[in-house]
Swiss-Prot record:
<keyword id="KW-0832">Ubl conjugation</keyword>
<dbReference type="GO" id="GO:0003723">
    <property type="term" value="F:RNA binding"/>
</dbReference>
<keyword id="KW-0175">Coiled coil</keyword>
<dbReference type="GO" id="GO:0000122">
    <property type="term" value="P:negative regulation of transcription by RNA polymerase II"/>
</dbReference>
<dbReference type="InterPro" id="IPR000504">
    <property type="entry name" value="RRM_dom"/>
</dbReference>
<feature type="modified residue" description="N6-acetyllysine; alternate">
    <location>
        <position position="165"/>
    </location>
</feature>
<feature type="cross-link" description="Glycyl lysine isopeptide (Lys-Gly) (interchain with G-Cter in SUMO2)">
    <location>
        <position position="4"/>
    </location>
</feature>
<feature type="cross-link" description="Glycyl lysine isopeptide (Lys-Gly) (interchain with G-Cter in SUMO2)">
    <location>
        <position position="99"/>
    </location>
</feature>
<feature type="domain" description="RRM">
    <location>
        <begin position="21"/>
        <end position="92"/>
    </location>
</feature>
<feature type="modified residue" description="Phosphothreonine">
    <location>
        <position position="304"/>
    </location>
</feature>
<feature type="compositionally biased region" description="Basic and acidic residues">
    <location>
        <begin position="293"/>
        <end position="303"/>
    </location>
</feature>
<feature type="coiled-coil region">
    <location>
        <begin position="184"/>
        <end position="216"/>
    </location>
</feature>
<keyword id="KW-0508">mRNA splicing</keyword>
<dbReference type="InterPro" id="IPR051186">
    <property type="entry name" value="RRM_HNRPC/RALY_subfam"/>
</dbReference>
<keyword id="KW-0804">Transcription</keyword>
<keyword id="KW-0694">RNA-binding</keyword>
<keyword id="KW-0687">Ribonucleoprotein</keyword>
Length: 312
C-alpha cells in the first residue's frame, strides 16, 4: 500500500527560491473546489511542497521553479467549477491582476506567518468604505439647443420666387399643348393620305383584275378570227372555180380579187395587233409604277405612325 503524503499549508516563505517556485491561482471557486482537488490538478507538473486555499484564490508551492512555470503554462485559462482560472507566477506580478489580489500577495511576502482571511476581510472593508466616501460624479445637464427663427425677408424671397415658377410651368404647359395640337393635325393629314392611298390601291387592283380577264378572253377571240378568215378564202376559191367554169375572164378576175383581199386583212390585223400589245405593256408598266409608289407611300406612312407613337 502506498500512503499519500500530505502537503503542508506553508506557502509564504521569503527566500528567493521559494518565491520563484510559487504559483498563484486566482478566480478560484473555493465553495466547490477543495485543497485536495488543487493538489491533484497541480501535482502532475512536479512535486508540490505546499498548498494553501483561501477565499477566491490559492497558492501552490513547488520544489523546483521549472515545475512551477510548466504549471502556469499548462493550467492558465482553464475553466474549473464554472470559472476561468487566472494562474501566474507569484513572484512576477501580472499587470491585469486585480488590485486586491496584488496587495494580498505583497502582504504575504511581508511576514512569515500571516492570517489571509483576516487580511482579506480587512481589505474588503476598507475598499467599500473608501468607495462610500467618494462623491458621485455629477451628470452634466443637456444644454437646450435653440432653433433659429425664420426671418421675414426669407419669407418675402420665397413669395417672390413663386410667380416665376408658376410662369415657367404655364409656359411649359402651353408649349406642350401646342405640340399636341401639331401632332394631332399631322396625324389627321397622315390619315387622309392613307385613305387616298388605299382607294388608289383598290382601284389599281380592280384594273388589274379587268386586264387579267381580258387577257384570258383574247386568245379565244384570235383563234375564232383565224378560223373565219380561212372559211372566207375557201368560199372565194369556190366562187373562182365557178367563174372559171363560166369563162376565162371571170376566172382571172376572181383569182385577182381573191389574191388581193387577204392582204388588207393581214395588214389590218397586224396594225390592230401591234398597238394592242404596246398599250398592254404600257398599262402594265404604269400599273407596276403605281403599285411601287403606293407601297413606298404605305411604308412612309407606317414610319411616320411609329414616330408619332414614340413621341406621344
Amino acid at each position: 500500500m502506498s500512503l499519500k503524503i500530505q502537503t503542508s499549508n506553508v506557502t509564504n516563505k521569503n527566500d528567493p527560491k521559494s518565491i520563484n517556485s510559487r504559483v498563484f491561482i486566482g478566480n478560484l471557486n473555493t465553495a466547490v473546489v477543495k485543497k485536495s482537488d488543487v493538489e491533484t490538478i497541480f501535482s502532475k507538473y512536479g512535486r508540490v511542497a505546499g498548498c494553501s486555499v483561501h477565499k477566491g484564490y490559492a497558492f501552490v508551492q513547488y520544489a523546483n521553479e521549472r515545475h512551477a512555470r510548466a504549471a502556469v503554462l499548462g493550467e492558465n485559462g482553464r475553466v474549473l467549477a464554472g470559472q476561468t482560472l487566472d494562474i501566474n507566477m507569484a513572484g512576477e506580478p501580472k499587470p491585469n491582476r486585480p488590485k486586491g489580489l496584488k496587495r494580498a500577495a505583497t502582504a504575504i511576502y511581508s511576514g512569515y506567518s500571516f492570517d489571509y482571511d483576516y487580511y482579506q476581510d480587512y481589505f474588503c472593508a476598507r475598499l467599500f468604505d473608501y468607495r462610500g466616501r467618494l462623491s458621485p460624479v455629477p451628470v452634466p445637464r443637456a444644454v437646450p439647443v435653440k432653433r433659429p427663427r425664420v426671418t421675414v425677408p426669407l419669407v418675402r424671397r420665397v413669395k417672390t420666387t413663386i410667380p416665376v415658377k408658376l410662369f415657367a410651368r404655364s409656359t411649359a404647359v402651353t408649349t406642350g399643348s401646342a405640340k399636341i395640337k401639331l401632332k394631332s393635325s399631322e396625324l389627321q393629314t397622315i390619315k387622309t393620305e392613307l385613305t387616298q392611298i388605299k382607294s388608289n390601291i383598290d382601284a389599281l387592283l380592280g384594273r388589274l383584275e379587268q386586264i387579267a380577264e381580258e387577257q384570258k378572253a383574247n386568245p379565244d377571240g384570235k383563234k375564232k378570227g383565224d378560223s373565219s378568215s380561212g372559211g372566207g378564202g375557201g368560199s372565194s376559191g369556190g366562187g373562182g372555180s365557178s367563174n372559171v367554169g363560166g369563162g376565162s375572164s371571170g376566172g382571172s378576175g376572181s383569182c385577182s380579187s381573191s389574191s388581193r383581199l387577204p392582204a388588207p386583212q393581214e395588214d389590218t390585223a397586224s396594225e390592230a395587233g401591234t398597238p394592242q400589245g404596246e398599250v398592254q405593256t404600257r398599262d402594265d408598266g404604269d400599273e407596276e409604277g403605281l403599285l411601287t409608289h403606293s407601297e413606298e407611300e404605305l411604308e412612309h406612312s407606317q414610319d411616320t405612325d411609329a414616330e408619332d407613337g414614340a413621341l406621344q
